[in-house]
Amino acid sequence: MNSDASATTNSWAINFDHVSVTYPNGTKALDDVSLTINPGEMVAIVGLSGSGKSTLIRTINGLVRATEGTVTVGPHQINTLKGKALRDARGQIGMIFQGFNLSERSSVFQNVLVGRFAHTAWWRNLLGFPTEHDKQIAFHALESVGILDKVWTRAGALSGGQKQRVAIARALSQDPSVMLADEPVASLDPPTAHSVMRDLENINNVEGLTVLVNLHLIDLARQYTTRLVGLRAGKLVYDGPISEATDKDFEAIYGRPIQAKDLLGDRA
């Protein structure tokens, strides 16, 4: 992480204090997790499917509410917020989903402008009259992920990798203090997966943002992040520098030997 960028960016810390999440069906997705993410860190969250990775990410922006403990993001105790207070906090938390969540019939530009809704008068959003300031932010976000040339293209006409870059630009246009990415490279080919991860790395290095990314690919975690958080059956089982994480550490997180599907490699 670039310390100079961090000094000029309103990047937030994230703190989990004995957080548990139990779903209505009785499934305990998180079990007494205590964890602090420092401002400007680039963190990989790894674990098998069902380990609690997505739940952890979603408690940060209030999409999932902690049933025990507290989740604090910057100045906000997220699990206590409701209504406008929660919407305002979410306006500072960028979120990138595996499924892109784009409006396929709208242009790339219109999709990216959605990230400005929390900062813009409601009537402008309703009528589609963005301010000149919002337009410039959208253009800059698209340029930063290398897809400005597609600004007027319909989102549905893009490739999977291009759609994910638009999703990143949309999150960037929020001017966030935290960036969350939930399996952002799932189903992408190796070159595109590396491209998306470089975009996230650039956001961390240049913008100084706190970035948390859920990954199931060990080699990508090692190449692009600096800290590893491991979850197994909802419990925090590993937390340390990614440079110190051995194959045995990953096997302990997964509860099994490393398999080919855990590595991106050069597979098609």
UniProtKB/Swiss-Prot annotation:
UniProt entry tagged with the keyword Magnesium: no
Annotated ranges, domain ABC transporter: 14-258
Locations listed in the record: Cell membrane
Role played: Part of the ABC transporter complex PhnCDE involved in phosphonates import. Responsible for energy coupling to the transport system.
Main location: membrane
Known partners and oligomeric status: The complex is composed of two ATP-binding proteins (PhnC), two transmembrane proteins (PhnE) and a solute-binding protein (PhnD).
Pfam family, one: ABC_tran
Keywords carried by this UniProt record: ATP-binding, Cell membrane, Membrane, Nucleotide-binding, Phosphonate transport, Translocase, Transport
InterPro entries the record matches: AAA+_ATPase, ABC_transporter-like_ATP-bd, ABC_transporter-like_CS, ABC_transpr_PhnC, MetN_ABC_transporter-like, P-loop_NTPase
Protein name (database record): Phosphonates import ATP-binding protein PhnC
Membrane disposition: Peripheral membrane protein
Cellular component terms (Gene Ontology): plasma membrane
Annotated GO MF terms: ABC-type phosphonate transporter activity; ATP binding; ATP hydrolysis activity
E.C. number(s) listed in UniProt: 7.3.2.2
Binding site for ATP: 47-54
Similarity section: Belongs to the ABC transporter superfamily. Phosphonates importer (TC 3.A.1.9.1) family.
Catalytic activity, as annotated: phosphonate(out) + ATP + H2O = phosphonate(in) + ADP + phosphate + H(+)
Cross-referenced PANTHER family: AMINO ACID IMPORT ATP-BINDING PROTEIN, PHOSPHONATES IMPORT ATP-BINDING PROTEIN PHNC
Taxon lineage: Bacteria, Bacillati, Actinomycetota, Actinomycetes, Mycobacteriales
